[in-house]
């Protein structure tokens, strides 16, 4: 069984990996419901930890524990080995609002839509995203992120979940005007720093990833509210299909798509402005905040 919640954090200027101490706390920073972190004594590199999980002997917390209030949480993975794999239009309600925005006819997808997002680094919880001068239509997308734990190739649907390491929250920040300009998603979804990730990685057997409430807020106003039960294509389907096309390496990040309620879905659209704070929340994982600056 893979259980627990892992974090990457900065304490007195030094990076550590740790496991959250399940002490029954409610709420708290980052919505984690925990006050203490037990450092891991193996490595401070989460990608190395994932890839070599069995060789490193799994989770081995050490003493002394530190308070969550004394540290700065970092993105649980500093940077991906390869660009993350993303799913587009994987909630029916979001597929409909996206097609309305583009003036296309509503329809349900028969097959998953896959794309990649250029990511040199994952942005930390409570980080600032600078939207720059290239977009006036910056949008938010709360997403369940799946992290692969072992290399997999030609994996069946029934075996697929055995290859999952854990889950996190991603915000797929997207420049809609750049997407429309280039008539595809890659550039508009790849602005520097446009993939905040965190606040932790919840190990696979700690929750039911297909029955989680998923929400986003802008300045405290609820914008997105759905459940991962509404995914059109579930996690085993995605892993099984992709592993047939190519090897999914340990540490691969897969972002499962977003529900309706994004800025472009409103009439008129409600895109992000300088000073806005986006809060992405998934039940059992936590809260991921990002502030928008110029």
PLM segments and residue spans:
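N-terminal non-catalytic cap/leader segment that marks the start of a structured domain
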Residues: 1-108, 277-279
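Catalytic-pocket segment enriched in acidic/His residues
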Residues: 66, 72, 94, 174-294
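A generic local secondary-structure boundary/capping motif
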Residues: 74-76, 102-105, 129-138, 152-159, ...
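A short secondary-structure junction signal
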Residues: 96-99, 125-128, 155-160, 178-182, ...
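Structural signature of FAD isoalloxazine-binding scaffolds in flavoprotein oxidoreductases
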Residues: 103-124, 140, 273-284
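Short catalytic-site patches enriched in acidic/histidine residues
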Residues: 113-131, 153, 193-200, 259-264
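Non-heme Fe(II) oxygenase catalytic core, chiefly the N-lobe of the double-stranded beta-helix
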Residues: 124-160, 165, 170-174
């Amino acid at each position: 069984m893979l259980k627990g919640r892992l974090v990457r954090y900065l304490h007195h200027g030094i990076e550590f990996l740790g496991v959250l101490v399940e002490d029954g706390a409610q709420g708290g920073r980052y919505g984690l419901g925990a006050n203490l972190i037990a450092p891991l004594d193996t490595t401070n590199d989460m990608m190395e930890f994932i890839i070599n999980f069995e060789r490193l002997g799994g989770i081995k917390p050490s003493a002394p524990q530190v308070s969550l209030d004394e540290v700065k949480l970092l993105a649980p993975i500093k940077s991906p080995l390869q660009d993350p794999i993303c799913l587009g239009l994987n909630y029916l309600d979001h597929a409909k609002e996206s097609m309305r925005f583009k003036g296309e006819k509503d329809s349900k997808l028969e097959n998953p839509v896959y794309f990649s997002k250029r990511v040199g680094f994952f942005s930390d919880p409570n980080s600032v995203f600078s939207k720059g001068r290239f977009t006036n239509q910056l949008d938010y997308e709360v997403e369940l992120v799946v992290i692969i734990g072992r290399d997999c190739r030609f994996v069946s649907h029934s075996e697929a979940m055995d290859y999952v390491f854990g889950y996190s929250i991603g915000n797929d920040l997207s420049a809609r005007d750049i997407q429309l300009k280039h008539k595809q998603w890659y550039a508009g979804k790849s602005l520097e720093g446009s993939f905040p990730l965190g606040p932790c990685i919840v190990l696979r057997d700690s929750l039911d990833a297909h029955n989680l409430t998923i929400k986003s807020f802008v300045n405290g106003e609820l914008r997105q509210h759905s459940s991962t039960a509404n995914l059109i294509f579930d996690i085993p389907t995605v892993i099984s299909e992709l592993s047939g096309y190519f090897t999914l390496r340990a540490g691969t990040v897969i972002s499962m798509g977003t529900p309706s309620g994004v800025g472009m879905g409103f009439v008129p659209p409600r895109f992000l402005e300088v000073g806005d704070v986006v809060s992405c929340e998934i039940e059992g994982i936590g809260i991921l905040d990002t502030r928008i600056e110029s």
